[in-house]
From Swiss-Prot:
It comes from Lactococcus lactis subsp. lactis (strain IL1403). The keyword Amino-acid biosynthesis applies. Catalyzes the sequential NAD-dependent oxidations of L-histidinol to L-histidinaldehyde and then to L-histidine. Changing K248N: In strain: IL1403. This is Histidinol dehydrogenase. The lineage of its organism: Bacteria, Bacillati, Bacillota, Bacilli, Lactobacillales. Signal peptide: none annotated. Changing K245E: In strain: IL1403. The gene is hisD. InterPro entries: Ald_DH/histidinol_DH, Histidinol_DH_CS, Histidinol_DH_monofunct, Hstdl_DH.
Length: 431
């Protein structure tokens, strides 16, 4: 199942394939989403309700758009206390990690009377998109909501599509309850994204949209970006495992498949110094996959977008990883902590054989909303800082402005901006 990749002189080619798995948006999809967004922008609730009926089969109107307290209670009754305990523990773990990301306000008081500084302010209102149906992920609710809560976002609303019965997945309701999210709208798809981006008669406009979705949701987020902020446009998931001869083959195989089961476009790559380990991992893959429900998806993704790269030494392994910039990076070597400084590009790093990537998907504390497709070279995972904006300010007394007067005027005139220069000089005309 696990093919060996010859990377000698082909690293750029490998990276291109690894990073080129993004689902291409067809002209038809893009055109359809543009029409939906324009319709919502122009016709508000009327268009929103029509699309909900057309795509989801739910006959939504102003009276049943919001999840009521009674509906929440009915859904929550289906959740046992142990699951609530797990959700609360997950939230606590995420909070403990993310509270260290809180932005700071600061100021500088100079002897000449100048005051400069930065003010950290949370976004006012954020929308969390949560996919509906059987593939609902309550962990994503917590991963997106906790950083926003810690940042101090005043209002978090949730949008999620429902089927004809109008019911929201109980696990999603439970996660929302644990996070204190009170407002849940029963709409989704591109129409839901457009509704929170532009606002309708019933749904308020937000400052930022976060959360995963299908190609229509992702395209709508991309189109609406600029009108509203978004988290990122995520592609298929990926994991890269760096391992030496001390690593356990069965652990590596299990971790590769854990990522591969997400999607047929998911990528699971092993980079190792041991050819023997590649053979052992392949044997484990073939053995373990027999008992897994998503076997077809796993085999397809590993066959088409997985593989093993054998390198001469561990430094070469990190060079490969830094070039690929994986969403998830596992380091399974004899001394993994000492090799942390070698890592330049990765969405999130999992160090040692008892820190498997799925722990990070749920309860390690780090966020699982991460850059994909090589974008970890310039993007970070979701954090508190994504829900904070920074306002800079400065105060200059007249005598200090006088000291800068000629330099600023000269600079402005060199750029042909004489009104800029005049803004400075006019303050000294009376002198």
């Amino acid at each position: 199942m696990l093919k060996q990749i010859d990377y000698q002189g082909k690293l750029e080619e490998i990276a291109e394939k690894f990073q080129g798995r993004k689902t291409e948006v067809s002209k038809e999809v893009n055109k359809t989403v543009q029409q939906i967004v324009a319709d919502i922008q122009k016709n508000g609730d009327t268009a929103l309700f029509n699309y909900a009926k057309k795509f989801d089969g739910y006959d939504v109107n102003t009276s049943n758009l919001l999840v009521t307290r009674m509906e929440r209670e009915a859904g929550l009754e289906q959740i046992d206390e142990d699951y609530f305990r797990i959700l609360r523990r997950t939230k606590s773990q995420i909070e403990e990690f993310h509270k260290h990301q809180l932005g700071n306000s600061w100021n500088i008081f100079k002897e000449n009377g100048v005051i400069m500084g930065q003010i950290a302010r949370p976004l006012e209102r954020v929308a969390l998109y949560v996919p509906g149906g059987t593939a609902a992920y309550p962990s994503t609710v917590i991963m997106n909501a906790v950083p926003a809560l810690l940042a101090g976002v005043k209002e978090i609303i949730m949008i999620t599509p429902v089927k004809a019965d109008g019911k929201v997945n109980p696990n999603i309701l439970a996660a929302a309850e644990v996070c204190g999210i009170e407002t849940i709208y029963k709409v989704g798809g591109a129409q839901g994204v457009a509704a929170v981006a532009y606002g309708t008669e019933s749904i308020p406009k937000v400052d930022k949209i976060v959360g995963p979705g299908n190609i229509f949701v992702a395209t709508a987020k991309k189109i609406c970006y600029g009108v509203v902020d978004i988290d990122m446009i995520a592609g298929p998931s990926e994991v890269l495992v760096i391992a030496d001869k001390t690593a356990k083959p069965k652990y590596i195989a299990a971790d590769l498949m854990a990522q591969a089961e997400h999607d047929k476009l998911a990528s699971a790559i092993l980079v190792t110094t041991s050819e023997k380990l590649v053979q052992q991992v392949d044997e484990e893959l073939n053995r373990q996959v027999q008992n897994l429900e998503r076997r077809e998806i796993i085999e397809s993704s590993i066959r088409n977008y997985g593989g093993a790269i054998v390198v001469k030494n561990i430094d070469d392994a990190f060079d490969v990883s830094n070039q690929l910039a994986p969403e998830h990076l596992e380091v399974l070597t004899s001394e993994p902590l000492t090799q942390l400084p070698k890592i330049k590009n990765a969405g999130s790093i999992f160090i040692g054989e008892y820190t498997p990537e799925p722990l990070g998907d749920y309860m390690s504390g780090s966020n699982h909303v991460l850059p994909t497709g090589g974008t970890a070279k310039f993007y970070s995972g979701l954090g508190v800082y994504n829900f904070i904006k920074y306002l800079t300010y400065s105060y200059y007394p007249k005598e200090v402005l006088a000291d800068f007067k000629e330099d600023v005027e000269t600079f402005a005139k060199s750029e042909g901006l004489t009104a800029h220069a005049n803004s400075i000089s006019v303050r000294f005309d009376e002198m």
